[in-house]
């Protein structure tokens, strides 16, 4: 049976319906249980990272290799024609799209990934993060991890902590979890880094419960998922960063009273917001979460590049 994601651009988590999300997650579970090293054997995929990345780039490229695809691309735009000669993004994408079957792209400018789709022809573009906007594949691995650990994606209590203003992962994850029934959100952030109003308005329109809090301990006993984020130094002026970086820090002692199966997630990199003593607790699940990126991204690549995927 033909799949609905074949040759589809994946720019925002809103490009995926609830059924699409379930399809990706089911495919990820199958690939985790049964690797397919030749599934993309004759495909060439561009890995175009105009912004620094460790986990996302390596996870995507590992996913490509483990499915048998050939990988071309760059991890620093400074050494490309765009960086050195002033070539436009439109021209860069127009050329790259003639070489490959799909483009995975990260860019510091919000909206850059959507712009790329206007110049990629029939070649699908997968957004690996555009500024503070969207990071849909991080959301897919987050959903996969939540489903694995909690056994469901509905009727969950989810707390999000830290930089909720610039943290694109929490924007995408909230929008995705809002597609499922009965979820409740707790947002814990300084006023300067509060969740954007458009996200809160979206939750209100859907009748989804949410609340604002000033400390992690206010909600610890209530939540199934505690999603920590770092304060993004690169998106703040130095004085603002100094004021807020240490405001929300999770320590092992803070986990007293947490639900037995509560999991602490983090998109990484971690700086100071989770102390290392948390790593030794059964609640810490951020490294397993990062590992799940392989399977979530494999699933998305497999679906986007196969019209009839049977695993």
UniProtKB/Swiss-Prot annotation:
Q: Which reaction does it catalyse?
A: carbamoyl phosphate + L-aspartate = N-carbamoyl-L-aspartate + phosphate + H(+)
Task: State if Transferase is listed as a keyword.
Answer: yes
InterPro entries in UniProt? Asp/Orn_carbamoyltranf_P-bd, Asp/Orn_carbamoylTrfase, Asp/Orn_carbamoylTrfase_sf, Asp_carbamoyltransf, Asp_carbamoyltransf_Asp/Orn-bd
**Classification via PROSITE patterns:** CARBAMOYLTRANSFERASE (PS00097)
Q: Quick one: which pathway?
A: Pyrimidine metabolism; UMP biosynthesis via de novo pathway; (S)-dihydroorotate from bicarbonate: step 2/3
Per its UniProt entry, which superkingdom is the organism in? Answer: Bacteria
> Which of UniProt's keywords are assigned here?
Pyrimidine biosynthesis, Transferase
UniProt-annotated binding residues for carbamoyl phosphate: 55-56, 106, 135, 138, 268-269
Group of enzyme by EC = transferase
Q: Which NCBIfam families match?
A: asp_carb_tr, PRK00856.1
What assembly does the database describe for this protein? Heterododecamer (2C3:3R2) of six catalytic PyrB chains organized as two trimers (C3), and six regulatory PyrI chains organized as three dimers (R2).
Q: Which family does it belong to?
A: Belongs to the aspartate/ornithine carbamoyltransferase superfamily. ATCase family.
Instruction: From the Swiss-Prot or TrEMBL record, give the protein name.
Output: Aspartate carbamoyltransferase catalytic subunit
């Amino acid at each position: 049976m033909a799949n609905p994601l074949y040759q589809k651009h994946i720019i925002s988590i809103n490009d995926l319906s609830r059924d699409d999300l379930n399809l990706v997650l089911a495919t990820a579970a199958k690939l985790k249980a049964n690797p397919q090293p030749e599934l993309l054997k004759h495909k060439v995929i561009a890995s175009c990272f105009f912004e620094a990345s460790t986990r996302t780039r390596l996870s995507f490229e590992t996913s490509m290799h483990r499915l048998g695809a050939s990988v071309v691309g760059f991890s620093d735009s400074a050494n490309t024609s765009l960086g050195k000669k002033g070539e436009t993004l439109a021209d860069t994408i127009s050329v790259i799209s003639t070489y490959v079957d799909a483009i995975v792209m990260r860019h510091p400018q919000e909206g850059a990934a959507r712009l790329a789709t206007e110049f990629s022809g029939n070649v699908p573009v997968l957004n690996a993060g555009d500024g503070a906007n969207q990071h849909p594949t991080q959301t897919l691995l987050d959903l996969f991890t939540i489903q694995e650990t909690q056994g469901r994606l509905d009727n969950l209590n989810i707390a999000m902590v830290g930089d909720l203003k610039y943290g694109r992962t929490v924007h995408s994850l909230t929008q995705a979890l809002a597609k499922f029934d009965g979820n409740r959100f707790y947002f814990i952030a300084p006023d300067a880094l509060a969740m954007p109003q458009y996200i809160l308005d979206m939750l209100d329109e859907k009748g989804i419960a949410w609340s604002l809090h000033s400390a992690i301990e206010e909600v610890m006993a209530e939540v199934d998922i505690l999603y920590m984020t770092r304060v993004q130094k690169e998106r703040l002026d130095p004085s603002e960063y100094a004021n807020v970086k240490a405001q929300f820090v999770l320590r092992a002692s803070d986990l007293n009273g947490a639900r037995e199966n509560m999991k602490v997630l983090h998109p990484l990199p971690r700086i100071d917001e989770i102390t290392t003593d948390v790593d030794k607790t059964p609640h810490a699940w951020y490294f397993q979460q990062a590992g799940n990126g392989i399977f979530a991204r494999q699933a998305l690549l497999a679906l986007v590049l196969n019209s009839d995927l049977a695993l």
